[in-house]
């Protein structure tokens, strides 16, 4: 590895530094803490809403958080939302209208930092209990700007990649569409122009840090914008097969502490 030590490290969470069963290795925690102690800015850049972040604060105890695939800047330490880039109601309604026509079996949920609402036929994987009833049509409750719109094929007839291909054509210029799990038949939709990469670029600019001095890690399509923007970036070897097309390098699987290994090497470089 050549070059200089980065000034900013940005990492996805799930499937990148957090195992699919929820554990974070001590080696990974130690690597991030050491980087932070050396003056490197740390950003955890995730599709998660803030209600899923307490375990990250508890594990690492350092860093900044960009949540909702770039739609929110969140203070891990105080638990406060600092900034949001939300999806307008008209964009939500147009998105639902177009996707219903293109994918008849689709169902929807909508979330902000403090709520999660779903259609009755939308079966949540993780937020069980936040909305036990649901509504017939999500349009009934689309009355406020949203952090993220979720669209699922409950019968899993289409994969997330297949759904994304359709949605990108139907929603071009209206919203940002991505996904974070090729096996879940689930799309994640944000306001136009909102992405992990776009928000990370804003934060770096505020810190007067160039893309060349930033390193990022990610495993799925919602990470690709961040991998593309950073001067050095690593797709996870066990992530989406298209990851290496968008990153400059490949890290070992998260199960082998791939991110920690790279950070340890980066910290040996001159400042």
Task: Name these PLM-found stretches.
Residues 60-61, 69, 77, 171-173, ...:
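Short, structured coil segments at secondary-structure junctions
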Residues 35, 46, 69, 149, ...:
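Residue-level signal for inorganic ion chemistry
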Residues 3-8, 24-25, 188-271:
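Mg2+-dependent phosphoryl-transfer enzymes with acidic/Ser/Thr/Gly-rich catalytic loops
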Residues 39-43, 62-63, 147-148, 212-213, ...:
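Short active-site oxyanion
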Residues 12:
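Active-site residues of response regulator receiver
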Residues 105-217, 221-229:
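Conserved acidic, metal-coordinating active-site core of Asp-based
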Residues 21-125:
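Active-site phosphate-binding/coordination module
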């Amino acid at each position: 590895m050549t070059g200089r030590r980065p000034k900013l490290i940005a990492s996805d969470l799930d499937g990148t530094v957090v195992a699919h069963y929820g554990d974070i290795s001590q080696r990974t925690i130690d690597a991030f803490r050491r980087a932070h102690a050396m003056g490197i800015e740390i950003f955890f850049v995730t599709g998660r809403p803030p209600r899923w972040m307490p375990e990250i604060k508890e594990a690492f105890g350092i860093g900044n958080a960009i949540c909702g695939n770039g739609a929110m800047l969140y203070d891990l330490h105080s638990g406060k939302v600092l900034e949001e880039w939300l999806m307008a109601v008209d964009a939500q309604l147009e998105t639902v209208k177009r996707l219903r026509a293109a994918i008849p079996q689709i169902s929807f949920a909508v979330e902000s930092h403090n709520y999660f609402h779903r259609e009755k036929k939308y079966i949540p994987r993780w937020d069980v209990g936040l909305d036990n009833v649901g509504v017939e049509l999500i349009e009934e409750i689309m009355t406020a700007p949203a952090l993220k719109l979720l669209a699922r094929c409950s019968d899993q007839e289409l994969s997330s990649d297949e759904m994304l291909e359709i949605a990108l054509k139907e929603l071009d210029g209206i919203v940002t569409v991505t996904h974070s799990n090729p096996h879940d038949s689930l799309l994640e939709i944000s306001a136009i122009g909102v992405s992990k990469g776009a928000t990370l670029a804003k934060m770096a600019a505020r810190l007067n840090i160039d893309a060349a001095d930033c390193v990022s890690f990610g495993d799925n399509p919602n990470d690709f914008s961040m991998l593309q923007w950073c001067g050095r970036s690593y797709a996870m070897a066990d992530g989406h097969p298209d990851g290496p097309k968008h990153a400059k390098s490949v890290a070992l699987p998260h199960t082998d502490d791939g991110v920690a290994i790279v950070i340890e090497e980066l910290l040996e470089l001159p400042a």
